[in-house]
Amino acid sequence: YISGACTHPDFRSKGVMRELLSQSFARMLRNGVHFSTLIPAEPWLFDYYARMGYASVFKYSTKEIVLPEFIPAKEIAVSVVPEFQEEIYSYLNKKLSERACCIQHTLEDFQVIMTDLAISGGYLFVARQENEIKGVTIIYKGDKHIIINELCAEDKDVEYSLLYAIRQHTGYKRMVQLLPPEDQQPQHPLGMARIINAKEV
C-alpha cells in the first residue's frame, strides 16, 4: 500500500515514475500478486496510468448531506481517533465486507491509511454505545465542504451522531458523501486496476 507517490521536479519527464512502476510490477509478480489497484490523485493521471496498463474500473456516486437541527442521542459517544486501533479496523473490515463489491484492506494497509489521514488533514470518528463500536466515518476537508470517504453505522441515530460530531469538530456545515456507484445517480471515475499475472487470472 503506497500513499502518495510523486517525482522530484528535477527528475520529471525522465521516465523515473515509469521505471518505478515497472519495478513494482515485477516485484508484485514475484510476490504472487494477481492485480494492482490505484486511485489517481489528479484527473490527468488517469491517462498516464492507462498508458501503463491500468483501466478505469471503479466508480463512485455522491450524496449531499443535510443535517437536521437537533441534538443527537446522549448515550452515543463520538470521538476523533488519531492513531491506529485494531478494534476499529476489525469493525470497519466487517462492515465493508457486507458490501456487494469492495476492496478489502489488510491490517497493515489500514495502518498506512491512518498515517495518511494525519498527513492530509483527515479525521477518523468512532461512535460508541456502552463501550461498543456502533459506527465509524473517515473524512477529508475539501475547499468548501467535508468529503465523507467512508460512513458505516448500525442505525440512523448513530449515523446522525457521527455527522453532528463532524460538524461540531470541523465547523463545516456542507458535507458530501462518496458512495458505491448507484444507477440512478451520476457516476464518477475513482480507481483503476491492472492485471499483474495474466496466466493465473
Model-identified regions with their sequence ranges:
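Amide-forming acyltransferase catalytic core, primarily the GNAT-like/NAT-type
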Residues: 55-151, 156-157
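Core nucleotidyl-transferase/polymerase catalytic module
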Residues: 3-5, 43-44, 56, 62
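Conserved acetyl-CoA-binding loop-helix of GNAT-fold acetyltransferases
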Residues: 4-7, 13-26, 156-168
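Conserved beta-strand segments that form the floor/walls of ligand-binding pockets within enzyme
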Residues: 1, 6, 147
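Short polybasic/polar patches that bind polyanions
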Residues: 12, 29, 50
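Conserved GNAT acetyl-CoA-binding A-motif
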Residues: 21, 28-41, 170-181
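Active-site/acyl-donor-binding loops of N-acyltransferases
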Residues: 50-72, 149-156, 160-201
